[in-house]
């Protein structure tokens, strides 16, 4: 059993030890990152999470998303392929998978997938738009699902305009009300993923998502709008993507998020250090030069393709070979090193953990967070 596995077991059994164990993990990662900048050969793949798009089908048409249209149209991951994937992940002691899409609840075998994953000892959570969550939650909860994350794109007509389908906000609210009536926060962890874009970089939008999360006893995760994901688009006239003239709005929004973090530390999933860095991630984009820790990740597409991360470093296809034949191969370790050295489009996936694992970035944004809080 690895040190990481032992630490996770201890944290589950003794939750009070989790902060200390996490701090130790981050410190070890910073040491490795520093060493990797001098000796890249020390960087090797060590998968901690696999993100799996189990279907490209979706019941929305979000402005920023290409799934089911230009990206893998019609693709669905077969149950047998998923079974082989999870068996290999469990054998390799991969701790967790995230199921998403598309809309994962549209997959006919989604409940069986959750049940199988949990039965093999692999942690499992799901990202969904929640439109039909109330119709599936009883079976999913019985199968072992305990955490759900959802995209948040505004409320009322603003939400409907973004997802390009009328009446969907009201349906989502109805679904969430039904879910929470049966499963409170002690039974089901809910998280809203707030997309920080040109449309939402304002205090009013942050207040809206804050009230919405509090209504459902949920946490908030902040996603800075992407500029390099193959399945993401920037909307008509690039209306989602930040521009230099947005700097004042971004700064005010980040300051307000830091204020909320100080008052309600558990509401926002990111640390104050990570939040302070988001201004640079939003405005500097690919000019940010922070080593990437994608060595911890794998991404699986609905067509069976396997990449190191959401953007690049193709490792193979599950329709042609098993995951066990890709994991920790020379190609996998090389991809991990290339990602670390930013020999790639340099996206901002895992931005929060990257700044916390990189000594110079940690010092910079720790000081910035303190200055802006005071």
Where are these regions (language model features)?
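Radical SAM enzyme [4Fe-4S]-AdoMet core and its adjacent flexible, acidic
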Residues: 1-12, 139-293, 297-307, 311-316, ...
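Secreted/processed peptides and extracellular or luminal domains of membrane proteins
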Residues: 64, 68-71, 298, 315, ...
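Flexible mid-to-C-terminal extensions adjoining Fe-S/redox cofactors in radical SAM and related proteins
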Residues: 9-10, 32-33, 41-42, 46, ...
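Residues that line or immediately flank small-molecule/substrate-binding pockets and catalytic motifs
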Residues: 69, 101, 152, 224, ...
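Residue-level marker of structural boundaries
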Residues: 71, 91, 168, 332-333
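A general structural signal marking secondary-structure boundaries and capping sites
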Residues: 69, 108, 180-183, 261-264, ...
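Polar helix-capping/helix-linker motif
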Residues: 13-16, 271, 328-330
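Conserved alpha-helical substructure of the radical SAM core
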Residues: 5-147, 228-229, 367-368, 374
